[in-house]
């Protein structure tokens, strides 16, 4: 079976009071991965990162859960992007 890849553009958001940043994952993690969080391989403008899609307590305006993927400072430096910038994201589940 072919592995599903999620590909989209997202604005990098600043993590308040932590100096970090993240992008939203615009899919329902429970529906897509049958779990509340998922270990993923992500690429931000082609720069690889292994991390997780998680719920950090954020909600969309309609009240639904907003899942996020952290984007490390080192990766932001490599792709020359900061909070407020648009980034191309590719995500796939990792074992």
Explain the meaning of each model-derived region.
Residues 1-65, 83-95:
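Long, compositionally biased stretches
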Residues 28, 71-78:
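Short alpha-helix capping/helix-loop boundary micro-motifs
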């Amino acid at each position: 079976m072919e592995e599903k890849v999620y590909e989209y553009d997202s604005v990098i958001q600043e993590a308040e009071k932590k100096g970090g940043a993240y992008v939203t994952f615009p899919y329902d993690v429970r529906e897509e991965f049958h779990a509340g969080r998922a270990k993923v391989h992500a690429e931000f403008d082609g720069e690889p990162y292994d991390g997780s899609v998680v719920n950090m307590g954020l909600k969309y305006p309609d009240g639904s859960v907003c899942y996020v993927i952290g984007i490390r400072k080192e990766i932001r430096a490599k792709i020359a992007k900061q909070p407020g910038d648009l980034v191309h994201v590719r995500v796939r589940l990792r074992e």
